[in-house]
C-alpha cells in the first residue's frame, strides 16, 4: 500500500507560518525551518511580554503617583496607607491619570487624606 500524505494540509500549515513570518529579515521570512523557529520564538516573546506589560504599567503608575505625592509632602507608601484608611476606592491607574492630567484633582485627594 502506498504511503498516504496530506500535501494540502501540509502546504496550508507551512503557508500559515510563512505568512506569520512576513516582514522578517533574510531567510527567516522564506525558508520553512528557519521561519518556523523564528515564529515560535516570536510567539513565546509575545506571550511573555503580555504578562510583563501588566507589571510594567503598574510600576509606571506607582512612579507617577509617588512623584505627585512627594510634591505634596507625602511618600507613596504614606499616601497609599492614608488613602486606604480614609476609604477612597481609587485604583493606581486612576490616581496616576489624575496625577498626570489633572494635578489639582490629585492635590484635592491628597488634602482630603492628610
Swiss-Prot record:
Keywords: Ribonucleoprotein, Ribosomal protein, RNA-binding, rRNA-binding. CDD domains: Ribosomal_L20. PROSITE patterns: RIBOSOMAL_L20 (PS00937). GO terms for biological process: ribosomal large subunit assembly; translation. It comes from the Bacteria. The keyword Transmembrane does not apply. It holds the Pfam family Ribosomal_L20. Binds directly to 23S ribosomal RNA and is necessary for the in vitro assembly process of the 50S ribosomal subunit. It is not involved in the protein synthesizing functions of that subunit. NCBIfam families: rplT_bact (TIGR01032). Belongs to the bacterial ribosomal protein bL20 family. This is Large ribosomal subunit protein bL20. The gene is rplT.
Amino acid at each position: 500500500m502506498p504511503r498516504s500524505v496530506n500535501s494540502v494540509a501540509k502546504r496550508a500549515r507551512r503557508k500559515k507560518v510563512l505568512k506569520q513570518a512576513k516582514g522578517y529579515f533574510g531567510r527567516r521570512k522564506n525558508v520553512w525551518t528557519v521561519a518556523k523557529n523564528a515564529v515560535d520564538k516570536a510567539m513565546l516573546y509575545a506571550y511573555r511580554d503580555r504578562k510583563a506589560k501588566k507589571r510594567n504599567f503598574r510600576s509606571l503608575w506607582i512612579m507617577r503617583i509617588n512623584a505627585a505625592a512627594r510634591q505634596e509632602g507625602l511618600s507613596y507608601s504614606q499616601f497609599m496607607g492614608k488613602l486606604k484608611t480614609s476609604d477612597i476606592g481609587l485604583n493606581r491607574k486612576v490616581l496616576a491619570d489624575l496625577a498626570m492630567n489633572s494635578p489639582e484633582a490629585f492635590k484635592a485627594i491628597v488634602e482630603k487624606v492628610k
